[in-house]
Amino acid sequence: MAEPAPPGESGGERILVVGPSWVGDMVMAQSLFMTLKARHPGCRLGVVAPGWSLPVLERMPEVDEAVALDVGHGEFGWATRRALARSLRGRFDRAIVLPRSWKSALVPWLARIPQRVGFTGEQRYGLLNERRRLDKAVLDQTVKRFVALGLPAGETLDGHVPIPRPRLAVDAANLAELRRAHGLSSRPAIGMMPGAEYGPAKQWPLEHFRTLAEALVAEGFEVRVLGGPKDAEAGEAIARGLEHVHNLCGRTRLADAVDLLADCRQVVTNDSGLMHVAAAVGTRVHALYGSSSPAYTPPLTDSAEIHTLGLDCSPCFARTCPLGHTRCLVELSPERLLAAVLAAERRLPVEEA
């Protein structure tokens, strides 16, 4: 990532993006970054984002500068925002604010950035000077909304928004070290991501993951269970006592997950942030949808298979099943996923030894 440009020394427009607070949304925001670089050659792009997301931003060649906003979830952090804004004064010509909260628009306003663009939301009339009305029926996907803010308003009225696919860089040297450190084998690897930050109505049953892991090992695969520290117990439930199944939840950094997912042949995943990471490194994705909708936040890749039952009660977008049965995920069988993985494997290129 390039060093920040001193005030007035950048050759093109200086654009600051206030980024989202979730892993998947940050990956999807790369589509906006790619659009800005294509539309404004020579521009310098800075991103204000939670500190945890900086390793992901470092894998995006479009980002010239990533600036950490170290404010806890739900915390206002007035002093932190004000200090950050002061450090940014005079350094940017335009700000694009992706979140719709009032506090998200504070830093660009306090930094006195001349043009401040975002969707109308939470009474931000004084903070943004180019407010856009969000028509959710027209801009019907999160990624479309992000990219639209980087385009002239008139270009997106019909909902036709060109979406470049996110593509995260992979660190081969780091991958080699990870393979050594965690004792990973030469077997073809399948990734599993059992977590979903939103809630249990987005989580495939752990017993299904374990049944699938057992079957995949019997077919000659290695299974890597990936997630954060909160997912460690789930990972242990899947991996316990199984040879060639590695519980890496909470044992790797987010940047490590990028490299490990790129090294997998395929992944089986809930609708989660790591699903979007896997899509952005070109790994084939088997995405499990229960309470959420693939129409709204799909994996941005042509190499994906969506697994959903399309029940009358879904998508409900609830954190926990309002009906108490979560049939939308319970009835997605491990046998269905095994068949899908094996069928896809027959179509994928053979790995070089």
Where do the model's predicted regions map?
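Catalytic machinery of carbohydrate-active enzymes
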Residues: M1-A353
